[in-house]
Amino acid sequence: MSTAVITTPGLIQFLNTMRNHMKLCGYSSGTVKAYLGQVQSFISFNRPTNLRNITGQAIQSYLNQLVDSGLSRSTIDQATKAMEILYYELFGKQLNLSGFKRPRKKRPAPIVLTSNEVCQIACHAKTSRNRLMIELAYSAGLRVSELVEVKVGHLDLDRLMLHVPGFDKNKRTTFFSKHLKESLIKQAGAKNTSQYLFPSERGGTLTTRAVAKFFKKALIASGLKKLATPHSLRQSFVNLMLNQDVDPVALQNTLDLRALNSLPSPNSKKAA
């Protein structure tokens, strides 16, 4: 490793050029700042006498050093992207990192709510529609994206079942609590089968952001200290089923879980 480094004026000029090119490519000012910071950290580590002396091997060694130092996956991803931009800026071609192994992403511990806690949150929802959405998401183990897409025709009220549309193997049928039947009948009202069960004010699809917003308000009003999100309802339903000794494979198929290891551990009570 060389003890001499490129001159400051030369480095500043290069970083300014790189900054301008990233802005032209549509990167936000925050992203540009972060990537330039990663480039400067690499140069301080590598100390090249000339930027064009930088090699793909040197970059890979630097990234491996970052991995070994225990940095998070997101930081490694940011550094990798910055190095790819740096290399392309210098040589006009893609950086080959085929031998570089990034650390695995750490899955956050699922936030599990008890049935009483779900009820507590639902009871503090501002409207009966919002309350029913919280209850149905929990009772049927729905993703938020699935919840907002439910149409009246997806309900089988006699059999207490809900058809969840999807592509090919992602199509499935789940179930819901009999205690929701009357509320669902009322919510469906005079809507035809092709209409959304929980439409927006304009009659279209309610956004997942809107669900997150009213869920957060209900959570705060409930007084619970868990950092739950709408997705916690699905995770909590899975935990409830496992505690009732439901076959994990059957549960995986019913809820379209990507892998059995995505299930929270039975009796999990962790809060973030």
PLM regions with names:
Residues 1-272:
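Conserved catalytic core of the tyrosine transesterase superfamily
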